[in-house]
């Protein structure tokens, strides 16, 4: 029986292994050759299930940076998995995320098995947008938007909403509306956020902001009394 160890060089990203018989003390350790990064990723990492791949990010910062690249699938193309349908069930304020294979022929009578992935636990959400590129946008009761990965359970809070020239203590009625989408030109996930204030029937102020995920970029499109429309949609089609 042999025990295998692996490590990663932060300089060249090469993987090597070593084994030593546990029943033979003092025997020299045998080393395997270095594995090139492209061979390692294309033949090992890319074949792992998504949950196992998520655990690999804990090996080193270098592994994590490679796996989390926005263009990872373009640099190391792999066979796309079969499309799946995402189900979200809300119970007592908790969201449960399920998925099942998408049927090839929806007209046929066939039973599908849904797999439970994650739930939001004690975090209470009341609104959900998406999914877009494997992520959804959830809304908390305190109007904070959260980008959530239903497979890995990772989440990222959006910046707190604010309106220029308005003292927060003077807010009488504030609302916000989010829409989640993908920019195919810049290849970035973006959130369109509209915030506005009203007191009774009087319109006070509103802003249109675009948030880009993965950066600190927050671009204000319009503000103050810019009234374009009462509804909008941003997403893939």
Swiss-Prot record:
InterPro entries: F-box-assoc_interact_dom, F-box-like_dom_sf, F-box_dom
Domain of life: Eukaryota
Residue ranges occupied by any F-box domain in the UniProt entry: 41-72
Protein name in UniProt: Probable F-box protein At1g53815
Organism: Arabidopsis thaliana
């Amino acid at each position: 029986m042999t025990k295998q160890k692996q490590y990663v060089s932060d300089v060249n990203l090469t993987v090597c292994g070593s084994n030593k018989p546990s029943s033979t003390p003092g025997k020299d350790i045998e080393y395997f050759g270095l594995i090139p990064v492209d061979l390692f990723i294309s033949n090992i990492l890319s074949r792992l299930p998504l949950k196992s791949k998520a655990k690999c990010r804990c090996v080193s910062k270098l592994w994590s940076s490679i796996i989390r690249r926005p263009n990872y699938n373009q640099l190391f193309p792999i066979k796309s998995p079969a499309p799946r349908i995402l189900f979200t069930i809300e119970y007592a304020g908790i969201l449960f995320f399920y998925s099942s294979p998408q049927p090839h022929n929806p007209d046929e009578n066939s039973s599908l098995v849904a797999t439970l992935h994650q739930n939001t636990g004690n975090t209470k959400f009341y609104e959900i947008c998406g999914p877009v590129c494997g992520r959804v946008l959830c809304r908390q009761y305190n109007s904070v938007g959260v980008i959530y990965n239903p497979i890995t359970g990772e989440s990222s809070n959006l910046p707190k909403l604010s309106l220029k020239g308005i003292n927060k203590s003077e807010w009488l009625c504030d609302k916000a509306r989010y829409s989640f989408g993908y920019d195919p030109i810049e290849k970035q996930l973006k959130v369109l956020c509209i915030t506005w204030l009203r007191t009774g029937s009087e319109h006070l102020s509103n802003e249109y902001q675009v948030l880009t995920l993965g950066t600190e970029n927050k671009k204000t499109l319009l503000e103050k009394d810019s009234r374009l429309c009462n509804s909008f949609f941003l997403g893939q089609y």
